[in-house]
């Protein structure tokens, strides 16, 4: 956990997590950031239960889009509505092409 918060004591060659944004969607916390030279971008998706991080998903140099499943009536067959609620912004700023991924909440 000290590495994630940036409080660990390491030499200068170690990776530094510099967060740029923190957003919350229900029990999921999204933290986006980059390294000091902005050559590596990352997104952490933490699932928090009763104040405890119970799951961590980590994405490096990936453009992440978060969607939320819409509610639908079970008795009818309709197109599933999955609106985008969050998109990573840092990969576009560092000027490189990265793979894209959708995280469904």
From Swiss-Prot:
Coiled-coil stretches are: none
Question: Which Pfam families did the record assign?
Answer: WI12 (PF07107)
Highest taxon of the lineage: Eukaryota
Per its record, what triggers expression of this gene product? Mechanical wounding induces a rapid increase of this protein. In leaves, this increase is inhibited by the addition of osmotically active agents.
Q: In which tissues is it expressed?
A: Ubiquitous.
Q: Which family does it belong to?
A: To potato anionic peroxidase.
Q: What is this protein called?
A: Wound-induced protein 1
């Amino acid at each position: 956990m000290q590495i994630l918060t940036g409080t660990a004591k390491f030499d200068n060659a170690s990776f530094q997590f510099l967060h740029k944004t923190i957003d919350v969607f229900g029990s999921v916390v999204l933290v986006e950031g980059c390294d000091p030279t902005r050559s590596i971008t990352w997104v952490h998706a933490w699932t928090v239960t009763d104040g405890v991080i119970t799951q961590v998903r980590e994405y490096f140099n990936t453009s992440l889009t978060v969607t939320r499943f819409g509610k639908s009536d079970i008795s009818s067959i309709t197109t599933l509505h999955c609106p985008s609620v969050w998109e990573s912004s840092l990969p576009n700023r560092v000027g490189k092409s990265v793979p894209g991924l959708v995280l469904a909440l």
